Amino acid sequence: MKIIRDPIHGYIEISDKILQIISTDIFQRLRHISQTGLAYLVYPGMRHTRFEHSLGVMYLVKEFIRYIKINSEGIESLDFLEDDEFIDLVSVAGLLHDIGHLPFSHTFENALSISKEVYGLDVEYYGKKTHVILGSRVIDTYLSHIIDKLFKNFNSVNFIQRVILSTPKTREEKFASSIISSAIDADRSDYLPRDSYFAGVGYGNIDLERLKRSLMYVNDRLVAMKKAIPVIEQFLLSRMYMYQTIYFHSVVGLYNAILSHAISRLIEKDLIPKIDPENYIELNDFLILSKIRESGKEFYDGIVNRRGFKRVKKDVVDSCYKFFEDNRKEINEVMRDSKGLILYHDFYDVPYSEDEIFVYQDDEIKPLSNVSNIISSLRSIKKGVIGYHESVENKLERINNLLKNC
């Protein structure tokens, strides 16, 4: 057994079984995949990676299961939680939920979207599912033989793949999927406090101990006890504040947009390996940064030296956001014609869906929105950021004309 000291969860114990997966080259690669793209250009402490986040999710999966088992006793039959090997398998699914992330995480996925929609390149892009679809293939390529050896009593590889893809077929898979990927899950319960810690802000500081001690699994659904309502409200508000102030910070958006267009250039010029599981070992942040100069001096200076690009001070919000969405074709043309030196980056997030969070109250399962006035007031976040390189400052007529309609 190994023990790792984590700044969020304290000591994390790792069994020799799980260590065999963590020690592989493909998992160690996550040490070199930024958790939050180029957010460190605005919040210098945000240099943490998908590696420690994945360890945190693995730890929380076991913690969640421990308390679900206690709290659900006598209410729901969860015989599969009596099997320690099953619990280990679910924790491995948590460990591997981000194994498919590309360099700079979601920023690379945005680059694939831009490559396809703006520059017309033939790339694999599956929207928000990109990293989990690729991750399923990465597991097949690099880890399936190890997983099969470690978990001989289960169809373990398919179990993990269906869990991380959120396509569960069995009751056990549905249970695992709800713990790893739902409105209140081990994933968000790790990244909110972790990202908050490294950003140096307090928005993501949730009462994690209280939350995990309040979880139950009833009628094949992850629910929280009534007494946890304030904790869930805090959780959702913390998430909203983190999106508003950190993830959707306008300057963070600008630099991630710059990097996205730079990566698109690298893809267009065949300067980085094809996005394929066989090439995943090579694909990390260091590779992209080493190639950035070849995408263009403007992008290199913008990303490495934080020079050259400016942001239009007026963010695109409300009716202006809708106008820009309705005129997306023209905006894409502006970006394409300027070769990425004029940028538009949009943010969109829904805090939660009403059918996602439930509370166990008076022997009934009730939607959180029925018992919380705070939650019903949460709204979607929609905004856009416009940026440009100083060399094209006199070529902003088309963007300025669009802004006049706002």
Regions found by a protein language model. Name each.
Residues M1-V92, H101-C406:
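Histidine-centered, transition-metal-coordinating active-site segments
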